[in-house]
Amino acid sequence: MSAQFVAFLLIAFNLSLPANAFISDGANASVGLFGNASSCPKAAKFGKGPPKSCTIPSDPNNKPASQLESWFTREMFEDLFPFANLGWGPSSCWPYSYDAFKIASRYFPEFGTSLNVNNTVYTADENKKRDLAAFFAHAIQETGENNNYLYTALPDQEASNCFYRGGFYNWFEGGPSSNFLNPETPGHSPTDGNSCTSAGRYCSASDQITFFYPCSNSTISNPAAPYKGCYFGRGGIQISYNYNYGQFQDWLKSVNITVDLLKEPNLVMTKMDPPLAIMASLWFYMTPQPPKPAMHDILMGNWNSGAQNSAAGYDGPIFGPTSLIINNECSGEDSKNPGGPGESRRIKAFKWFNGYFGSPVGPEHTLSCGKMPVKLNAIPHYQSYQPDWSSSWKPERCDCAPASYGGLVYYFDPNYYPASFVAQNDLNRKKCIETVYANPSMYFMDKKNSLCLNY
């Protein structure tokens, strides 16, 4: 039976390959249906390659090893991402390496480990592998080499084996040579992102966003790329816009890492103590931003999709709604390989990585969010803390209360979010109250219409 036919059966009947289907050849990574990196054509390389000496990834907090490290090895990482870092491969001198991935995962001990997962649809082993498959699938779409030429040069399965090994290729949005950067330094070194053109600023402004996460207006004497406050996409699953850089900065502070990403956003690509390029991506993958659950929690079934979605099969541990969180993509999977970008690429990559790990993809119709009746932003629940309008007119201290619309001070509804985030609610309520007094005008409050400000 040919490898191509086996692959067809796996996908057509939603089957998974047993983990022991891989045969180690001793020198290389896994060989078999999903091949290995050494059998792939070399990727295009950009830049001069990694330096001979550098600052390697380290963790100032010395976090203990994650359970992920017990099963996802350096050999597996380097087999899956041989073309990382603009084609040069994993390197501890550059943003993407197993060491950087390992350190980042230690800050998220639930990632790829099945900790605090209660679904009975999949085994603990299947859950942890599906978690990694989803994260890597989104990285393929966001920063993969995505070399369509492989499908004209190789048989279909062999082409897929190399295509989906192209993750963590790009550093910057629009890479490998980004139009957001100076044409003379277009993104072939991590430091190239220290300044940008006006198109790369990605500065979102409103009264509340500017209060919490103001953009830097600093410039340098470089007419081709004069701006320092550049919040375009960086990292494996690219975070973008000042409010995401700012929220990531807030989280870093909560784990004893002080860094000013609003002033120096390119530290996401250059900081190595700890390395932030993969950590920023894991933070985005693991963290809910109401009304959006964390992608991880959707994969693990730790979310509440609502009655209408549940009746349509969109509940529990599924993949499809995760595509809503990054780019609101619900166009489904293309029939041919490699297909186009967007949700189709995410789905195909998710299938490939699950095949590699020997884990199931889940019901076919839930791989896309296209038939999901109620999208994430329309599921009714409390989402943020806002001034308590029921008491703001009273001559008593101002308070905040959960509101059914979004904001930058999150409320984690206990019916929709995991307990670890619900535990943040009391602190977030106090934060909201502080901002009411610090800047009441952004809530359209003053001492005349809101007597509580006098107390």
Where are the model-predicted features located?
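A positional/structural detector of protein chain ends, strongest at the extreme C-terminus
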Residues: 1-4, 453-455
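Cleavable N-terminal signal peptides of Sec/SRP-targeted secreted and luminal proteins
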Residues: 2-21
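Cell-wall glycan-active module
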Residues: 16-219, 224, 291-455
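Alpha-helical segment that forms one wall of the substrate-binding/catalytic cleft
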Residues: 98-108, 230-311
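Short secondary-structure capping micro-motifs at structural edges
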Residues: 222-225, 265-267
